[in-house]
Amino acid sequence: MVALLAPNPDLVDQVHLLALTLGGQNEGDVGPRGEGFYGGYFRDPDGNKLCVYCRT
């Protein structure tokens, strides 16, 4: 799995939404996950799993 670090939660939301709009599949809704972590998971059209996240 590839993890992409974003500078803020707004960009995490935007990237996750864009990935789904472009044909990706949701693998985990965007939101807080434990202390200091905000992220979401998706698979690209080729099936690769990615995470976009930021530290909060």
Language-model segment annotations:
Residues 41, 52-56:
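Short beta->alpha transition motifs characteristic of CBS
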Residues 49:
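Glycine-rich acetyl-CoA-binding "A-motif" of GNAT/NAT acetyltransferases
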Residues 2-45:
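Vicinal oxygen chelate
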